[in-house]
Amino acid sequence: MSGGTFPAFVSAGDILTDMVRAGDAQWTSVPGGAGWNVARAVARLGVPSALAGSIGEDCFSDVLWRTSDAAGLDLRFLQRVARPPLLAIVHETRPPAYFFIGEASADLAFDPARLPAGWTDHVKWAHFGCISLVREPLAGTLAALAADLHARGVKISFDPNVRNLMTAAYRPTLAKMAALADLIKVSDEDLRHLFGGDGPDAVAAVRALNPRTAVLVTRGAQAATLYADGDVHEASPPRVEVADTVGAGDASIGGMLFSLMAAPQRSWREHLAFALAAGAAACRHTGAHAPTLDEVVALIEG
């Protein structure tokens, strides 16, 4: 999607190609990136969206461009530069084992100054997270962008979405982004990696980073908890036949953000139900599926 209007939602940072082992000497390339998945999820549900990031001019980046266009994302926010692509090499899938190839790669060249003039006057929510907040100089660029948007009154969503690049050096960025956020989403895996456990103490540590913000804690097929406006809401995801859990967390936060933008009159409990249904709908498909509104509503209505 391009044109004179501006998206209400922008996800900034993560867009890459997953190289997934398909045999001893075979690999399959798949468009990916947590931030990109969230942008696609929100767009598929019905809110005009964009992925603000940078890709190369190579064959992998051509696929990312075409797939972003097909997903309805605003291509004015996706920059192209003459640099190599960022690749995630997924050499095992059960459980996932991976590493990244991306020295001086295209994602690091993202420049907010090249985004279309006036977009910040129209965006309602902006999303940040995952490896883009670890890889410099991109991490600093995105943290500064988040701070600027926050100062302008744009609501900020933050999902750490833990990857193996997040060492102790990530802590200051975690604290900075959490302080800016109006919504923080963490999984039980995030809690274990960042805080050494997934129990009440770990949840309390997340909430202490920004006591005023809403915090969504997901636990796969188990009950999720939402802390918001002084209340605690708990709900279980709809039961579905699981084909794949890849991208389920991205679909879940995408569902939450869509619900907050499209139906702000809903209660927090209703927003939580929508988010969990979106994540469950994604699990019915292989790959990082962006569910339709009909799929999500059908699960909510049972």
Which stretches of residues belong to each language-model region?
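Glycine-rich phosphate/adenosyl-contacting loop at the front of the ribokinase-like
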Residues: 1-73, 242
